[in-house]
Amino acid sequence: MLSVYSDDHRLHFGQSELVDGKLQPCFEMPSRADTVLARVKSQNLGEVIAPKDFGREPLLRLHDAAYLDFLQGAWARWTAEGHSGDLVSTTFPGRRLRRDGPIPTALMGELGYYSFDTEAPITAGTWQAIYSSAQVALTAQEHMRQGARSAFALCRPPGHHAGGDFMGGYCFLNNAAIATQAFLDQGARRVAILDVDYHHGNGTQDIFYRRDDVLFASIHGDPRVEYPYFLGYADERGEGAGEGCNHNYPLAHGSGWDLWSAALDDACVRIAGYAPDALVISLGVDTYKEDPISQFRLDSPDYLRMGERIARLGLPTLFIMEGGYAVEAIGINAVNVLQGYEGAAR
């Protein structure tokens, strides 16, 4: 299986995040991708290539131009005002505040407009890192368009919490959605996205919620007790043309392979019935039993079984890296999914 990777991910590294009332080093750190890359190489998964540059146009298919301009220029504006630390929002358009404009012109106001939490710090290298992460996804997608049955986009920062015009949860650009749209623009009639990250892919859901050319299925922690709290419930089935194309599987804290795999089986049945031309996997491995910010109980061998079950769908499959914060195990678990898939797909 071909993997696509860029060293540019190291340009983004937030100084700290607020966890349980305390500032601590960010869980979303460069060593995550470095560890996965090392495992890809040690297991001889296949060739590793650098991304091509497809420009901003594929990003603009889903992300607002003003939002991209903001992300690209925010750090320069921040430092021009005399600041040096991470740029993090502190004010958001909550209940009974205006959300439909006008967009504030002050930097902190505009940042709050485009953010839904404090977990997406902008640093000096953030734009280049997130831009390259999207190009990683697009390069892997192009490899599949040229005939490959699978590919792995080792994206960092992750993307599934990012919407068309908002960021949060470590995410700025939605890599999985961008690659999905590229499949459609190049002739696919339908594409399915299966999000196996511990946290609900609220950004991906929002982007495709009213469309019938993308089926979205997500297996995640119950939002009643788990981030992102305000989306990811089972009754969210899509709207308008997209009604019936959104499937959420919220699971309780402590869920292990038995409950998780039952949800996977149901999601796979729905995906098979949808008959997509391609499948995109938002590959988060923060479902691992020792992940520091998650509450599921999957073990490393379970990720082999996950890949095997996905392979039985018999679909061209693009894997896009999302979460996973147990750094010592992230490479083993992510590559186990890929090896499980490859072993069953032969």
Swiss-Prot record:
PANTHER family: HISTONE DEACETYLASE 8 (PTHR10625:SF17), HISTONE DEACETYLASE HDAC1-RELATED (PTHR10625)
Purpose of the protein: Catalyzes the deacetylation of acetylated polyamines such as N-acetylputrescine, N-acetylcadaverine, N(1)-acetylspermine and N(1)-acetylspermidine. Plays an important role in the metabolism of acetylated polyamines in P.aeruginosa. Is involved in the degradation pathways of N-acetylputrescine and N-acetylcadaverine, that allow P.aeruginosa to utilize these acetylpolyamines as a carbon source under glucose starvation. In vitro, can also hydrolyze artificial trifluoroacetylated and acetylated lysine-derivatives.
Highest taxon listed in the record's lineage: Bacteria
Keyword Metal-binding in record: yes
Stored SUPFAM superfamilies: Arginase/deacetylase
EC nos: 3.5.1.-, 3.5.1.62
Gene: aphA
Keywords in alphabetical order: Hydrolase, Metal-binding, Zinc
Gene Ontology biological process: epigenetic regulation of gene expression; polyamine metabolic process
Protein name according to UniProt: Acetylpolyamine amidohydrolase 1
Organism per entry: Pseudomonas aeruginosa (strain ATCC 15692 / DSM 22644 / CIP 104116 / JCM 14847 / LMG 12228 / 1C / PRS 101 / PAO1)
Phenotype caused by lack of the gene: Cells lacking this gene are unable to use N-acetylcadaverine as sole carbon source for growth, and display an elongated lag-phase of approximately 6 hours before growing on N-acetylputrescine. The deletion mutant strain exhibits only marginal changes in biofilm biomass in comparison to the wild-type.
Pathway assigned in UniProt: Amine and polyamine metabolism
Catalysed reaction, written as an equation: N-acetylputrescine + H2O = putrescine + acetate; N-acetylcadaverine + H2O = cadaverine + acetate; N(1)-acetylspermine + H2O = spermine + acetate; N(1)-acetylspermidine + H2O = spermidine + acetate
Subunit structure: Homodimer.
Cofactor note: Binds 1 zinc ion per subunit.
Cofactors named for this entry: Zn(2+)
